Amino acid sequence: MAQPPNPYAALTPTEAESSGPFEPETLLPLINRALPLAQALPSQSPLVAVGRGSSGRTFLGVNVELPGLSPLHSIHAGQFLVVHLALNNERTLNCLAFSSNGSYFDPPCPHCCQLLQEIRNASSTKLLITDPSRQRDMSLSTYLPQKYLSLYNEVPKYFFARLLDENRNNGLTLINPNPIRDCLDSEICNHLSCRALKAANRSYAPYSKSPSGVALMDFQGRVYSGWSIESVANPILGAAQAALVDFMTNGGGHEFNNIVRGFLVEKRDAKLSHLATAREILNKVAHFSFILRVLHCQ
C-alpha cells in the first residue's frame, strides 16, 4: 500500500523555484498546509515558520505544545524549523517567515531569535515581516534585545557557523559500551545506543560543554533521534524535543504514544544534565510502557 505524502516534506529547489519568490502570496499555500500540523491546544495559537535553506529547499516548522506539560517544554515553531534544517543537513538559512494565519508575517519570539542567531551567516537571513501598511525584509539582529546582542559580540567567532554543521563530531565515546552491541559501523546502524551517541556527537553545546543525544524507537522498530541545541543567551532546546521533531517529520506525526523505548547519551560529569527534563517529557507523552535508558560518554 502506498504511503500517504509526508505533510512536513520540504519543497525541492525546483518546487520552491516554480512556486515563486519568497513572498506572502507564494507562501500562503505552505502556511495553510502547515497550520493544521501545529499542536497548540492550550494556547489556541498555532504558528508556522517557513525557511529556505542554502540548498534551495524550503522547510516548515510548527509550534508543538506537549500535552500535560509546562509551556516551558513546548517546541517553538522556530526551534522546530532549526531542527528540521539540521536533520536535513542544511548549512545556512537564506529566507525566513513566521505566520499564524497566512495574512500577516510576524517577527520571531525572543527564544527563537536567539537560537536563530547561532546559524551561520544569520545576519544575512532575509526575515519577511508584514504589517497593514507595508511589507519589508528585516535582519534577525533587529529583533534581538540589545543586552543579548552585546553577548554575541563577546563570544569568540569560532563558536558560530556551527549550529547547522552536518560534519560536526564532538568526539564522544561511550564509557561502558555493551560488547554484544559493538558495531562494525556505528554510523549506519540502528541500535538505539549508537543512534543516541551519534546524536550527542552532533549536539551543539559550545557554552555549557554538556552535549546530549536522544534516540527513540516506535512500535514498528523505527528509530528517531535528536540532539541538544544551545544559544549564548541561555535558551536550550533539549535532545528529547529535537528527537520528537524527527519523529513528527519522518512519519510519526503527533502519535507520541507509539514511542516505546529511548536512550539518552550525555557526559557523566556534565555541568548541565538533560536527563530529568527528557524523562519528564517522554514519560508524559510516550506509551505507558516507555523505558528510557541512560548511557554516559566521555
From Swiss-Prot:
Pfam families: dCMP_cyt_deam_2. SUPFAM superfamilies: Cytidine deaminase-like. GO terms for biological process: cytidine deamination. Binds 1 zinc ion per subunit. Its cofactor is Zn(2+). Zn(2+) binds at H76, C109, C112. Coiled coil: none annotated. Belongs to the cytidine and deoxycytidylate deaminase family. This is Probable inactive cytidine deaminase 9.
